[in-house]
């Protein structure tokens, strides 16, 4: 699925796609259709898609949702690595622990308005 997407965009090759898949803890040789994956594996594939082109800005919505404790730790480490690479991470989450661990700035938004902002809420 990801290789096909990359080929459509024409921006990266097989090696970059496989690297992104490995970085999220999946096996590049696994050829299942997206719908056959568990929720946690789908979440990992979505994150692989977000990072495979090494973008300057990465938008993630509930990146640890559906993952077990080991998976949560792996994805948090991956997000930290992307931050160290210089990527700006925009993270939407209801998970307070994710915000404490990953966020430099936190915004509480309700009804489309910023209610509070800071390093913690």
Model-derived segments and spans:
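Hydrophobic anchor residue at the start of the ABC signature
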Residues: 47
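Conserved ABC ATPase "signature" region
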Residues: 3, 12-29
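Short loop immediately C-terminal to the Walker-B catalytic DE motif
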Residues: 64-65
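Catalytic Walker B motif of ABC-type/P-loop ATPase nucleotide-binding domains
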Residues: 58-61
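Helix N-cap at the start of a conserved alpha-helix in ABC-type nucleotide-binding domains
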Residues: 69-70
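H-loop/switch region of ABC-family ATPase nucleotide-binding domains
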Residues: 93-94
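Conserved catalytic motifs of ABC-family nucleotide-binding domains
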Residues: 54
């Amino acid at each position: 699925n990801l290789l096909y997407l990359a080929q459509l965009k024409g921006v990266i090759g097989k090696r970059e796609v496989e690297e992104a898949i490995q970085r999220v803890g999946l096996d590049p040789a696994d050829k299942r259709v997206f719908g056959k994956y568990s929720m946690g594996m789908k979440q990992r594939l979505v994150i692989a898609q977000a990072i495979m082109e090494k973008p300057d800005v990465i938008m993630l919505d509930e990146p640890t949702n559906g993952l077990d404790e080991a998976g949560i730790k792996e994805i948090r480490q991956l997000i930290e690595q992307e931050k160290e690479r210089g990527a700006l991470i925009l993270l939407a989450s209801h998970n307070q622990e994710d915000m404490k661990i990953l966020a430099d700035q936190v915004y509480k938004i309700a009804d489309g308005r910023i209610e509070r902002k800071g390093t913690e809420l």
